[in-house]
Amino acid sequence: IQSPLWHEQRYKSAFHKSYNEFPKNSLLEGVLIPEKLKKGKVKLRISYNQFEKKIEGSKYTSKEIKTLQIIESNSINYSLKYKDRKNLDQLFLKRNSCDDIIILKNGLVTDSSYGNLVFFKNEIGYTPEEPLLKGTRRAKLLHEKKLAEQFSKQLGTEICDEWQNRNHSKLLEISKLIKEMK
């Protein structure tokens, strides 16, 4: 299990925020990976409420992201990781022919539909100060100082605005964007 400490911290925080008490057991207590899922990457989903936990596992397949559509939503709230992703899914449907989306909230870059964003400028990684969800990998990289401690709320917005002004489009082509940022 990748980043167990960070998953545990997010679990405790979310549990407390939802139920006004801390959980009595560890998130990962009782997690057993079936033999058939012990090879390769596995996506582990742990759903819980105040009284019980449900653990599901499936093979993980990553998807290659080549294009991103910029979508604005000032009303979206995903501060806790929910099984119900209806609001994110509705935004994702607006991607046209793109592979994924970049979500702007109140004019600021937040996340993609699937995870946190990192922008590199002069070989320094920046992540939005106010993501929709503070992901576990993001927390780990910030703690390890692999991302800049100084957040730039505007960095992502500047990159997106610059791209849109030059290309007259809200479509970001990742390969071109990466070449131009170097």
Which residue stretches match the model-derived regions?
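Helix-start/capping segments and mature chain N-termini
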Residues: 1-43, 47-182
